[in-house]
């Protein structure tokens, strides 16, 4: 046990007894030096981009720690919005099939299976319009005929592989934002909250369907969940991207709340000690450099044009980009102000153009293009938000995202080994 940090008392361990009821893959921060966070943006079919990045990160961890290594073994919190929420569930829901003889706490999917999953199922989740439903026909249907997609295939798919798995049954702590359209307020589904509030311990399938229910694209999702006293709580939810398309700050906030509450699993980490935070935030690409709209165009728009214009949804594009950018800007400010910028890695591409910038074009050509975007992004230099201009610019060091992920993988591997060496359960 590290004498500088001190040992973990038996009383602290007993106070975290609720964790022993959960099958978790990652030992808590109290056994290590860091709190580790992975965040995945929303973006529909563009989830292929983070899928490519995550596959690379997991492959680096497997090179260090063996082929059984999974992302869930290294992160205290994995957060995701919309398509990011679906990826979170894939990476953290436990595989109940018993296919892993050496280790029972394995997730349903490896990171390398995310992209094939999207390539296989996206054409049915986002069926492309044909015949009279193309062009103006599609426009009229979208304006007066309900959401673009009925969501049935997505619902059946998610319910099929997640079953009745509850939020607290995830293999690490999960944070997934949604938005309650009845109460007009965000709902953050967090494993930390769900442990003590049964009403928030919803099925992962309901949470994934809800956070993916993008207005105009998929129907809103209603479900109920009982609290510990048997009282039913109603949820009327839509896409979490309305509140936090980039859920990085949501995840940091959930961790910070646990630190403030002195949850013993957090050890002696201080809320403002960002040298002890390690955050990887992965985007789904941005159309900001495409400059699709301008003031001359928008000055002539009425309600309908703001909702639907030339195959796009300007009002949603504006909200999504604004929320996405502000979170990254604020995160960058905090880490740079506290001299911890090397602990924060944001990977995103702000140069998407044409169909690549859509959230629902599921043609083979477009999906292959998104895979190429993800692969090219690995080769690009690490960029950070310039605090004066607000734009991304490469950092001074000539480091690619691929190289940065290798460095983070090494830090994550060392942190995991440190926790295992300090854990009484794992000592021989």
Swiss-Prot record:
It is found in: Cytoplasm. It holds the Pfam family Patatin. Disruption phenotype: No visible phenotype under normal growth conditions, but mutant plants exhibit an impaired response to phosphate deficiency during root development. Transmembrane segments: none annotated. The active site is at 82 (nucleophile), 239 (proton acceptor). GO terms for molecular function: monoacylglycerol lipase activity; phospholipase activity. Residues 38-252 form the PNPLA domain. Possesses non-specific lipolytic acyl hydrolase (LAH) activity. Catalyzes the hydrolysis of the neutral lipids monogalactosyldiacylglycerol (MGDG), digalactosyldiacylglycerol (DGDG) and phosphatidylglycerol (PG), and less efficiently the polar lipids phosphatidylcholine (PC) and phosphatidylinositol (PI), but not the storage lipid triacylglycerol (TAG). May play a role in root development. The nitrogen atoms of the two glycine residues in the GGXR motif define the oxyanion hole, and stabilize the oxyanion that forms during the nucleophilic attack by the catalytic serine during substrate cleavage. This is Patatin-like protein 3. It comes from Arabidopsis thaliana (Mouse-ear cress). The gene is PLP3.
């Amino acid at each position: 046990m590290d004498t500088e940090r001190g040992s973990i008392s038996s009383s602290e361990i007993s106070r975290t007894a609720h964790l022993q009821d959960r099958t978790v893959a990652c030992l808590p921060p109290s056994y290590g030096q860091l709190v580790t966070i992975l965040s995945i943006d929303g973006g529909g079919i563009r989830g292929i981009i983070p899928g490519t990045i995550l596959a690379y990160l997991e492959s680096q961890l497997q090179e260090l720690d063996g082929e059984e290594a999974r992302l869930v073994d290294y992160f205290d919190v994995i957060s995701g919005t919309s398509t990011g929420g679906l990826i979170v569930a894939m990476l953290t829901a436990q595989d109940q099939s018993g296919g892993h003889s050496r280790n029972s706490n394995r997730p349903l999917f490896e990171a390398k299976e995310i992209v094939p999953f999207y390539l296989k199922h996206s054409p049915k989740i986002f069926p492309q319009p044909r015949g009279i439903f193309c062009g103006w026909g599609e426009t009229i249907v979208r304006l007066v005929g309900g959401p673009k997609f009925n969501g049935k295939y997505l619902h059946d798919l998610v319910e099929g592989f997640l079953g009745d798995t509850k939020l607290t049954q995830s293999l690490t702590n999960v944070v997934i934002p949604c938005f309650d359209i009845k109460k007009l307020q965000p709902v953050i589904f967090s494993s930390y909250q769900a442990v003590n509030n049964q009403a928030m311990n919803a099925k992962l399938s309901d949470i994934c369907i809800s956070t993916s229910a993008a207005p105009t694209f998929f129907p809103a999702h209603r479900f109920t969940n009982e609290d510990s006293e048997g009282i039913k709580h109603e949820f009327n939810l839509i896409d979490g991207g309305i509140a936090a398309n980039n859920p990085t700050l949501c995840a940091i906030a959930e961790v910070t709340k646990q630190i403030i509450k002195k949850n013993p699993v957090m050890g002696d980490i201080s809320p403002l000690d960002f040298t002890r935070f390690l955050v990887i935030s992965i985007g789904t690409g941005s159309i900001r450099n495409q400059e699709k709209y301008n003031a001359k165009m928008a000055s002539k728009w009425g309600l309908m044009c703001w909702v639907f214009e030339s195959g796009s949804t300007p009002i949603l594009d504006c909200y999504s980009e604004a929320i996405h950018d502000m979170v990254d800007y604020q995160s960058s400010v905090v880490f740079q102000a506290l001299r911890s910028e090397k602990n924060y890695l944001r990977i995103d591409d702000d140069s998407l153009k044409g169909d690549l910038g859509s959230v629902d074009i599921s043609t083979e050509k477009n999906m292959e293009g998104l895979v190429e975007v993800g692969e090219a992004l690995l080769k690009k230099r690490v960029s950070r938000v310039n605090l004066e201009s607000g734009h991304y610019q490469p950092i001074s060091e000539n480091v690619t995202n691929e190289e940065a992920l290798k460095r983070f993988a090494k830090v994550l591997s060392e942190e995991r080994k440190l926790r295992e060496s300090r854990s009484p359960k794992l000592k021989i």
